From Swiss-Prot:
Family to which this protein belongs: Belongs to the PAM17 family.
Chain's gene name: PAM17
Major site of localization recorded for this protein: mitochondrion
InterPro entries: Pam17
Complexes and interactors: Component of the PAM complex, at least composed of mtHsp70 (SSC1), MGE1, TIM44, PAM16, PAM17 and PAM18.
Residues annotated as transmembrane: 55-75, 90-110
Function: Component of the PAM complex, a complex required for the translocation of transit peptide-containing proteins from the inner membrane into the mitochondrial matrix in an ATP-dependent manner.
Annotated protein name in UniProt: Presequence translocated-associated motor subunit PAM17, mitochondrial
Source organism superkingdom: Eukaryota
Localization of this protein: Mitochondrion inner membrane
Residue stretch of the organelle transit peptide: 1-52
Origin species: Candida albicans (strain SC5314 / ATCC MYA-2876)
Length: 185
């Protein structure tokens, strides 16, 4: 009897495969090696992402204007002949400005790829925090149907929230908006 009990305990599935890890399971050491992203770190990364996108937009805008200017500078144009009824220099100036605006709009795509490359280690946690933050905004956001000129809705998408202090102020502004919209209806 005793030997049967020992054998049954030795040859159980758990005892046989306790040293093995299956592909469907994960180890606890991989999750413990990466520290969790705090809200303060998330807001710092969000601010860094916005700054990189803005700087990239400025540089690509200047680059787009320069490329448009260099292209239009090589075209031979009769200065006295109007283009679609407008002065040619005005059309060329408008084209340079349009090239700069298109370059500025391309900038955030380049900036976001730069941000992803520089913060590759924290990117997954940043995106998880970002979805959690946006879901919190969606829950706490007031109904915009009652906005007016005297009572505008506060930062609907939360684009100006870069710290916990800003988030708390946004919540206060949302509560003030709700209170004003209920009182004056």
């Amino acid at each position: 009897m005793f030997s049967l009990g020992v054998q049954s305990r030795l040859f159980t599935r758990r005892a046989l495969f306790s040293g093995f890890r299956f592909n469907s399971t994960t180890t606890t050491t991989t999750t413990a090696s990466q520290p969790r992203l705090t809200w303060v770190d998330y807001f710092q990364l969000k601010k860094q992402n916005n700054r990189i996108n803005t700087i990239a937009g400025v540089f690509t805008g200047l680059g787009g204007a320069f490329i448009t200017l260099s292209y239009l500078g090589n075209i031979e144009i009769d200065v006295e002949k109007p283009i679609m009824g407008f002065d040619p220099l005005m059309v060329m100036g408008g084209a340079v400005i349009l090239g700069g605006l298109v370059g500025f709009l391309v900038g955030p795509f380049i900036g976001s790829s730069i941000f992803r490359l520089t913060n590759r280690a924290q990117l997954k946690q940043f995106e998880l925090k970002n979805t959690e933050f946006l879901s919190r905004l969606r829950i706490k956001r007031p109904d915009p149907s009652s906005q007016s000129f005297s009572n505008p809705i506060p930062d609907y998408y939360g684009e100006k929230i870069y710290s916990l202090k800003d988030y708390k102020q946004w919540l206060r502004d949302c509560n003030a908006f709700r209170r004003k919209s209920k009182e004056f209806l």
